[in-house]
From Swiss-Prot:
InterPro entries cross-referenced by the UniProt entry: FAS1-like_DH_region (IPR039569), HadA-like (IPR016709), HotDog_dom_sf (IPR029069), UPF0336/Enoyl-CoA_hydratase (IPR050965)
Gene Ontology process terms (BP): fatty acid biosynthetic process
Species per Swiss-Prot/TrEMBL record: Mycobacterium leprae (strain TN)
Family: Belongs to the UPF0336 family.
Name of the protein described by the UniProt record: UPF0336 protein ML1908
GO terms assigned for molecular function: (3R)-hydroxyacyl-[acyl-carrier-protein] dehydratase activity
Cited Gene3D superfamilies: Hotdog Thioesterase
Record-linked PANTHER family: HYDROXYACYL-THIOESTER DEHYDRATASE TYPE 2, MITOCHONDRIAL, HYDROXYACYL-THIOESTER DEHYDRATASE TYPE 2, MITOCHONDRIAL-RELATED
Alphabetized NCBIfam families for the sequence: PRK13691.1
Signal peptide: none
Length: 166
């Protein structure tokens, strides 16, 4: 295992906040082909009982990417040329994300292990509002290996998983 196991149990708090933008939500909804009116119109969101445009469910991945990049930029994980593939993710929403929300993030490293020559890291990512209320949690599994191309990873359509080939 090339990845440092002492990151297990580590808590990484993203030092900045993320404000959910109106046009950013609309652009994201268009990009992922979500055409629900609540993603575009304050009036449509109000009809559903919300004070602002609702962000698409996967919108928080933008913020999550900032948090992951910050972590890998600032924490010595033991590999300089690591190739990382996200192999699983699960979201648990506690409340909707709305335009204007000020969000904070924390990433907990739950486990670090090695399988088939690749390092597997499982994280729990928590997103809270400016007043500390839990908005959502994401459980992410990352697989990484040294960037020497000694093995190749590819997506297997039949199994729906990332597999390693020689």
């Amino acid at each position: 295992m090339a990845l440092k196991t002492d990151i297990r149990g580590m808590v990484w708090r993203y030092s900045d906040y993320f404000i959910v933008g109106r046009e950013q939500c609309r652009e994201f909804a268009r990009a992922i082909k979500c055409d629900h009116p609540a993603y575009f119109s304050e009036d449509a969101a109000a009809e559903l009982g919300y004070d602002a445009i609702v962000a698409p469910l996967t919108f928080v991945t933008i913020f999550a990417k900032y948090v992951q990049l910050d972590f890998f930029r600032n924490v010595d994980v033991g590999m300089e040329t690591m190739q990382i593939v996200q192999v699983d993710q699960r979201f648990v929403f506690h409340k909707p994300v709305l335009v204007g929300d000020k969000l904070w993030a924390r990433m907990d490293i739950h486990s670090v292990s090695e399988r088939f020559g690749a390092d597997i890291v499982v994280t729990k990512n928590s997103c809270t509002s400016d007043d500390g209320e839990l908005v959502m949690e994401a459980y992410t599994t990352l697989m990484g290996q040294q960037g020497d191309n000694s093995s190749q990873l590819k997506w297997d359509k039949e199994s729906g998983q990332v597999i390693r080939s020689a």
